[in-house]
């Protein structure tokens, strides 16, 4: 029973004896001992081949067996002994895996093998068996030795292996390991160049050939070796010069035609890998086009599409075609905005100065040479949001590590005498209320400021004339002279025929903050606007006021009259006039259809291959408004000349496909993201494809289930005035339109991105509006504020005033909301004045319209008559700036004001002329601090386009230091953890809020943002940015659903409720409980300090931890990860190589980010 064990122990002890004997013979090293050494090594080889335990004994570190064997190999000159030792090593490294191979490398085995290879080649003819053994071992060792390439070159082994392969082209047994070793050699860029000069390409092209079922393993290795060599630009040029690219294309076609059962997909993909590497250089791309490579790969890929297992071929082909697709110029005269607004002064060295100080005649749309010699490595790392554009930084580069800079410092940038002017905006702290009868009082609300000089003719609902709706809409009054037969309708001659079921505003006071989702609008046909009879034209519209208490079409028109825009808009969009009622159903996040992106990319490639099918017809152009566009009645009609509209140009490329170009922010040459435009003259039941072709961000939630929104006028007239999520086949990917270095921050070779979606319209000759997100205009805000003020009750202290005027001459409203004091007694007045201040703001970025909807929810809650709202008003004094950037909102900007700058980057040192809203908002905060009324909470509402859920960014010294790479002890940092209370409350109360997405890290690139400046300079510990997703939620009650206006307004009201609960933790009566609460949070914070998602998502999270798609298409088109310049030449490929002896397919890295 114990015999096997005893035998094993005996064999183990025997091999140890043999190793000792071999070591002794090595030390004696007498020539006469060759026979003895040969005999001992033979016995060891036999034992290793037959006993697993023997292999373990010899290969273990403690036995010293590896050193003894390598020493024998280095010293012996006997052929048979050498073969025996090589056999021993082959057995050890074959079964032992990486551990034994690592031991072999660490003991200098690689150098000994290479020296043996070189010395054996000097005595021709070389022994075939010896060379076979050496190369078989090198194949195993090479990928594990990080310096293998350098060692091979220094020992002179490169040409030895190459010559051996050259003279054994028909000897497949020896040729295979030679090619495998050459593949490992070539992973070093210097070696690849050297082998190319020595004729390696020519040798490999003698092996690579047309379809054959023989020696497929050899062919695969040869192709992989060739691909490795072609990573070198010099070798790629050599391949082009010798005409190898057409040869590869012909070989690929031959394999494609003959491999009908798809048994050799790996070989076909390897051929594509060679083509891909050649096209990494400009000369290669040119040769590819000249060899009809686009057509060849397009046709073969099209034939592969029905077979799912051929996706790797389609993906690689797509990558090559997109890389070789010629860069196109955006069809624009300039990338600067169509509209120009002269500034009072232009700061030297700023972005606007750079924009307008370009030499005359400079083309800012595309560079003279937009292609670099090497392909672009996609390093776009533009980040989102609150505070964007951090550049290309590693995880800890942007985190502030200077404790002195992190500690809040209250700075008096202006003397108090200058700040006294803001006392006017804080009258609640000085009013005595002696003249108010508290038994029968109403809040004194100043009337809305209406300047008759600002009134201009306004025409309601817009679009180009459409046969189906021409009798339902008033005519447009244009700034251009009218033809004699045109008779414009005066605004005053239009009356709104409301339905009889409308309700008075007074009946809706107590329902504020809640939309009546299930209310029905009585249907009925609409006769529309009669312009050919009668003295008065009547437009019957749905009575949205019955559903939406704060919307009044007539009042909206009055508000539009006093709104100043740079283009001088005289038109009103239907959705803004009719209003939007939130849907009473949930809209799920769109499930991505497999292959949709690939299909869109192939359709783009067809433009080059079948260029005669492209119409290229301009149907809308803001750059050329004076010249009429030809219209055959078949094209869609576009318009964006209304408040917040943004569409610069529309080009019909196919019968039902349109390329759309967005306008830059005014006084800027980029920020193309927000869109809002109108479409008419459509056919029902037809799939229309729209491509927005000048997007700039490197990724988007459109890749993760977000849809555009659409408003149908026909549906609104029929009783459904809703913005709805729409669009299928939605994806976002890099296109072939070049971005100039002027627009890309000095970087050359950049491209724009396409956001594409497909829509099928339901009604003939409808008028539909499309937007990036639910529009919320400045005029809509003014309307809502006036309706809110009209609904104010005696218990509410409400004051609305303009803090300042914007650059464009629009007022920036400031609201003060709290509860009236119970009486005019000193005690009640003192209680009134001692309430903490809450400062809220929103819409500093015009394209983040969701922040306005959240603010609307907060305002409606604050003005409602619910007990919670009354309690909240009694707890705090609210200072609210609902729109920090009215000019940007009005003029359809995405991020900037008329100054051409991101206002959320100006809080450190705002300019009174260029950034008046920020200047005066900061001054008001400074006044509050100077008078001892520093806000308890500051929160700036934002929107986030590349993350889901609602979350917050705050400021913490401890958490910032924890996330930095500086070894700083935080034990001595005393920090009140109260900044975490409000986010934690929100996570418990608001379904859309995600605490795990919050971050409290302070970054250097954010030092000029509202959140950081108010925390650092004003001393507000609870200073936040609250980000609301533009897409939807992936957790909680709304998981899997896109977000709508009702959810956003709910978030605003829940924020107010969280402030009410926050009072418990900040009230002096609750300090004991508050301290224990903070202790719990301290422990919780320590538990989570090492969780990766605590790092600031504002800077580093690009893909928002979204799951990868099954569709492995690289949206960037030019991903070239293997050419990472940061890696050492010897480390660039060696460490990642698969086992060369395996024919398994190399993993394809062209995955969608």
Curated annotation (Swiss-Prot):
Its cofactor is Zn(2+). GO terms for biological process: C-terminal protein deglutamylation; cerebellar Purkinje cell differentiation; chordate embryonic development; eye photoreceptor cell differentiation; mitochondrion organization; neuromuscular process; olfactory bulb development; protein side chain deglutamylation. It is an enzyme of class 3 (hydrolase). GO terms for molecular function: metallocarboxypeptidase activity; tubulin binding; zinc ion binding. Residues 364-389, 1108-1128 have a biased composition (Acidic residues). Zn(2+) binds at residues 845, 848, 942. Binds 1 zinc ion per subunit. Residues 774-1063 form the Peptidase M14 domain. Keywords: Carboxypeptidase, Cytoplasm, Hydrolase, Metal-binding, Metalloprotease, Mitochondrion, Nucleus, Protease, Zinc. Gene3D superfamilies: 2.60.40.3120, Leucine-rich Repeat Variant (1.25.10.10), Zn peptidases (3.40.630.10). Signal peptide: none annotated. The active site is at residue 1027. It is found in: Cytoplasm; Cytoplasm, Cytosol; Nucleus; Mitochondrion. GO terms for cellular component: cytoplasm; cytosol; microtubule cytoskeleton; mitochondrion; nucleus. Its EC number is 3.4.17.-, 3.4.17.24. Residues 357-400, 1108-1153 are annotated as: Disordered. It catalyses: (L-glutamyl)(n+1)-gamma-L-glutamyl-L-glutamyl-[protein] + H2O = (L-glutamyl)(n)-gamma-L-glutamyl-L-glutamyl-[protein] + L-glutamate; C-terminal L-alpha-aminoacyl-L-glutamyl-L-glutamyl-[tubulin] + H2O = C-terminal L-alpha-aminoacyl-L-glutamyl-[tubulin] + L-glutamate. Residues 1141-1153 have a biased composition (Polar residues). Belongs to the peptidase M14 family. Metallocarboxypeptidase that mediates protein deglutamylation of tubulin and non-tubulin target proteins. Catalyzes the removal of polyglutamate side chains present on the gamma-carboxyl group of glutamate residues within the C-terminal tail of alpha- and beta-tubulin. Specifically cleaves tubulin long-side-chains, while it is not able to remove the branching point glutamate. Also catalyzes the removal of polyglutamate residues from the carboxy-terminus of alpha-tubulin as well as non-tubulin proteins. This is Cytosolic carboxypeptidase 1.
């Amino acid at each position: 029973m114990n015999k096997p064990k005893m035998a094993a122990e005996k064999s183990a002890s025997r091999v140890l004896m043999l190793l000792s004997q071999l070591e002794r013979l090595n030390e004696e090293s007498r020539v006469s001992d060759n026979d003895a050494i040969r005999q001992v090594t033979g016995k060891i080889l036999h034992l290793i081949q037959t006993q697993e335990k023997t292999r373990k004994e010899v290969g273990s570190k403690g036995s010293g067996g590896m050193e003894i064997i390598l020493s024998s190999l280095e010293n012996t000159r006997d052929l048979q002994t050498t073969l025996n030792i090589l056999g021993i090593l082959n057995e050890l490294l074959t079964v032992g895996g990486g551990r034994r191979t690592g031991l072999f490398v660490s003991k200098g085995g690689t150098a000994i093998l290479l020296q043996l290879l070189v010395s054996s080649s000097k005595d021709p003819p070389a022994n075939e068996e010896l060379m076979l053994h050496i190369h078989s071992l090198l194949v195993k060792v090479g990928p594990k030795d990080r310096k293998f390439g350098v060692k091979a070159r220094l020992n002179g082994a490169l040409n030895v292996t190459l010559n051996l392969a050259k003279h054994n082209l028909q000897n497949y047994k020896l040729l295979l390991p030679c090619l495998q070793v050459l593949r490992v050699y070539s992973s070093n860029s210097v070696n690849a160049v050297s082998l190319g000069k020595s004729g390696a390409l020519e040798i490999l092209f003698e092996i690579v050939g047309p379809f054959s079922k023989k020696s497929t393993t050899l062919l695969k290795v040869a192709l992989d070796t060739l691909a490795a060599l072609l990573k070198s630009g010099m070798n790629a040029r050599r391949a082009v010069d010798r005409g190898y690219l057409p040869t590869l294309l012909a070989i690929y076609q031959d394999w494609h035609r003959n491999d009908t059962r798809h048994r050799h997909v790996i070989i076909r993909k390897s051929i594509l890998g060679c083509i891909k590497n050649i096209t990494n250089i400009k000369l290669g791309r040119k040769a590819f086009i000249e060899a009809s490579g686009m057509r060849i790969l397009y046709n073969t890929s099209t034939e592969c599409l029905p077979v799912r297992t051929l996706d790797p071929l389609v993906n690689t082909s797509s990558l090559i075609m997109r890389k070789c697709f010629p860069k196109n110029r955006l069809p624009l005269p300039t990338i600067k905005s169509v509209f120009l607004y002269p500034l009072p002064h232009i700061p030297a060295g700023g972005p606007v100065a750079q924009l307008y100080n370009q030499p005359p005649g400079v083309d800012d749309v595309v560079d003279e040479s937009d292609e670099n010699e090497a392909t672009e490595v996609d390093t776009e790392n533009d980040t989102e949001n609150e505070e964007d554009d951090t550049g290309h930084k590693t995880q800890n580069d942007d985190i502030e590590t200077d404790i002195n800079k992190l500690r809040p410092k209250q700075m008096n940038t202006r003397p108090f005498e200058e700040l006294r002017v803001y006392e006017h905006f804080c009258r609640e702290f000085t009013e005595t209320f002696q003249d108010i009868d508290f038994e029968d009082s109403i809040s004194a609300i100043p009337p809305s400021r209406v300047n008759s000089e600002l009134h201009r003719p306004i025409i309601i609902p817009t679009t180009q004339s459409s046969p189906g709706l021409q009798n339902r809409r008033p005519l447009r009054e244009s700034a251009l002279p009218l033809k004699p037969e045109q008779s414009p309708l005066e605004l005053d001659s239009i009356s709104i025929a409301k339905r009889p079921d409308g309700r008075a505003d007074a009946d809706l006071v107590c329902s504020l903050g809640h939309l009546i989702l299930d209310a029905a609008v009585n249907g009925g046909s609409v006769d529309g606007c009669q312009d050919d009879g009668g003295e008065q034209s009547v437009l019957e519209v749905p009575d949205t006021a019955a559903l939406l208490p704060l919307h009044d079409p007539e009042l909206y028109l009055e508000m539009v009259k006093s709104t100043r825009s740079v283009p001088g808009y005289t038109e009103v969009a239907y959705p803004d006039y009719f209003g939007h009622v939130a849907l009473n159903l949930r809209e799920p996040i769109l499930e991505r259809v497999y292959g949709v992106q690939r299909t869109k990319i192939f359709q783009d490639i067809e433009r080059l291959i079948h260029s005669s099918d492209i119409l290229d017809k301009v149907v809308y152009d803001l750059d050329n408004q004076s010249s009429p566009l030809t219209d055959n009645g078949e094209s869609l009609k576009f318009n964006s000349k209304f408040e917040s509209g943004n569409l610069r140009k529309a080009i019909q490329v196919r019968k039902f496909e349109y390329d759309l170009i967005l306008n830059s922010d005014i006084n800027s040459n980029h920020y193309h993201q927000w869109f809002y435009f109108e479409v008419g003259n459509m056919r029902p039941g037809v799939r229309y494809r729209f491509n927005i072709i000048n997007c700039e961000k490197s990724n988007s939630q459109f890749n993760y289930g977000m849809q555009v929104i659409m408003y149908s006028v026909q549906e609104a007239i029929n009783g459904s005035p809703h913005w709805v999520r729409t669009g299928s086949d939605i994806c976002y990917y890099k296109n072939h339109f070049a971005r100039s270095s002027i627009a890309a921050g000095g970087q050359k070779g950049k491209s724009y991105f396409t956001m594409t979606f497909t829509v099928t319209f339901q009604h003939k000759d409808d008028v539909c509006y499309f937007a990036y997100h639910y529009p919320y205009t400045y005029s809509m805000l003014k309307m809502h504020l006036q309706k809110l003020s009209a609904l104010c009750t005696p218990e509410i202290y409400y004051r609305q005033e303009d803090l300042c005027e914007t650059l464009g001459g629009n007022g920036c409203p400031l609201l003060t909301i709290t509860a009236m004091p119970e009486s005019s007694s000193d005690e009640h007045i003192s209680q009134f004045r001692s309430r903490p201040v809450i400062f809220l703001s929103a819409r500093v970025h015009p394209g983040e319209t969701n922040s306005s909807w959240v603010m609307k929810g907060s305002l409606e809650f604050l003005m409602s008559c619910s007990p919670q709202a009354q309690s909240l008003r009694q707890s705090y004094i609210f200072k609210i700036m609902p729109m920090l950037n009215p000019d940007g909102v009005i003029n359809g900007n995405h991020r900037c004001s008329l100054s051409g700058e991101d206002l959320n980057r100006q809080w450190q040192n705002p300019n009174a002329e260029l950034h008046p809203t920020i200047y005066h908002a900061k001054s008001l905060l400074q006044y509050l601090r100077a008078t001892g009324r520093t806000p308890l909470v500051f929160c700036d509402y934002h929107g986030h386009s590349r993350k889901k859920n609602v979350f917050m960014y705050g400021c913490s010294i401890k958490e910032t230091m924890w996330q930095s790479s500086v070894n700083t002890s935080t034990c001595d940092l005393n920090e009140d953890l109260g900044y975490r209370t409000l986010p934690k409350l929100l996570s418990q109360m608001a379904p859309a809020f995600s605490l795990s997405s919050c971050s409290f890290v302070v970054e250097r690139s954010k030092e000029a943002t509202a959140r950081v400046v108010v925390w650092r300079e004003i001393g507000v510990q609870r200073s936040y940015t609250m980000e609301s997703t533009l897409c939807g939620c992936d957790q909680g009650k709304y998981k899997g659903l896109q977000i709508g206006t009702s959810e956003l307004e709910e978030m605003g009201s829940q924020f107010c409720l969280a402030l009410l609960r926050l009072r418990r933790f900040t009230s002096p009566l609750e300090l004991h409980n508050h301290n224990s609460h903070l202790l719990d949070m301290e422990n919780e914070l320590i538990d989570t300090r090492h969780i990766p998602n605590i790092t600031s998502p504002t800077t580093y999270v690009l893909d928002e931890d979204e799951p990868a798609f099954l569709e492995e298409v690289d949206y960037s088109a030019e991903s070239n990860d293997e050419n990472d310049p940061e890696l050492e030449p010897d480390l660039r490929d060696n460490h990642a190589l698969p086992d060369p002896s395996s024919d398994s397919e190399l993993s394809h890295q062209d995955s969608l980010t």
